[in-house]
Amino acid sequence: MITGMDARRTWLVTGAAGFIGSHLVEQLLLAGQRVVGVDNFSTGLRENLDLVRGAVSAERGSLFSFFEQDIRDRDGISELVSRSKPDVILHQAALGSVPRSIEDPLSSHESNVDGFINMLDAARKVGVQRVVYASSSSVYGDIGDGAKVEDRLGAALSPYAATKRIGEIYAQVYGRTYGLETVGLRYFNVFGPRQDPNGPYAAVIPRWLAAMAKKNPTAIYGDGSGSRDFCYITNVVQANLLAASVPSSSAAIHSVVNIGCGATTTLMQLQQLLRRHIARVVGCQVDQIPEPALEPIRQGDVPHSLADISFARESLGYNPTHSVEQGIAELVQFELAKTA
């Protein structure tokens, strides 16, 4: 059991109907915690909340309260935080996607910067103990191809990256000025069940899985040699709960921490992993699943992304339980079982 989870606390999870948020809500309820969820359904899905309720007992489900609320609504968020009086906030709400931010930078700013500072300010007014918030590996920008270390940043390559970096700065300022404990988690390419495969801004793994399971063609932006540190959702849930529970003396407090696996997978390797596991589950030959088409690299994409997770290990006790292949195997089994 993670330290601090033996006593019941009240947790506010923003983006509760989203991919990561819904997994956090589920694990907190399974641990007997009181959870308040917030989402405006701009990208979150009501289906995810139904899945959470179906995964926990009625007794545990009664510990969950949900509010449809937009974090950009300053007064609304302030009132909700004041009313719920959470001990901890896990802030996952954001408008994700680099391409989306390039198409519509103002909406990304409103959700990721204005919405986040609304949450920070509501938290400090009520006296919330700690805010753990989702940042992104995109803040590293053009730093280079080596393992990314928290204190070395390059130039931001997209409005999305800029919004996440601004959020980190605000969190640290609120820590220094008001004493609000914050921990930022720089996620590296999170994947897992409940990740939406639909729409123009869908992440690569759910999009590819949905297409390949139907033996439809897929595309790689670039020549396939680009690499990412893909991190399974179970690892990310662990990181959030650890960040919420470590002592106030931890070096992670008022800082940012890389959350990945510390290993890279090229996009072509990812394709082969998916093809192999999909073929195994559906009972077909690997070569029956089409090879990907190659398309030009998208604006704002970086060629390589790898997390140095030594600070996460030292400051949080973080230890990834799932490798990329273990996560892919679990994900494919889960997703294709739904359509069997």
Would you name each region that the model predicts?
Residues I166, Y170, Y174, V204, ...:
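Hydrophobic alpha-helix immediately C-terminal to the catalytic Tyr-X-X-X-Lys motif of short-chain
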